[in-house]
Amino acid sequence: IDSEFTKQISKQNKVIATHISMGIDFFDFEPEYWDVMVSNPPFTNKRKYFERALSFGKPFALIMTNTWLNDSAPKQLFKDKDLQLLMFDKRMKFISPDGRDNDKITFSSSYYCWNFLPKQIIMEELQVTKKKVSQASLESFFETV
């Protein structure tokens, strides 16, 4: 799967892309050499994904819905593990594997990060085109982190 993450990050860094559709399970696999994880995990079992990501002891950024902030788990993670949050002024658009985008996103999402951002909460402007999040917006973000 050639995600927007992979496209943008691989412009300046080596990327090891994995996906469950490739038969690679996040809970069973860890690349031999890697520095940072950026992922869009399923929106179910959020706490399990965070526990697994934290177990590596390496920086990460996971996309999660902002409604998760209402749960007790992220509050505890912000307190105990210094979880970080990259929020946007607009809703992210998600593009399906077949290239279709969804203009009717009913929820907002953020990157929930650990040991990744220069401060605990960052608010960024998200440049959105009619089709998808602008390439420049993602490129700019990944150049600054």
Across the structure, where does each feature detected by a protein language model lie?
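Class I S-adenosyl-L-methionine-dependent methyltransferase catalytic core
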Residues: 1-145
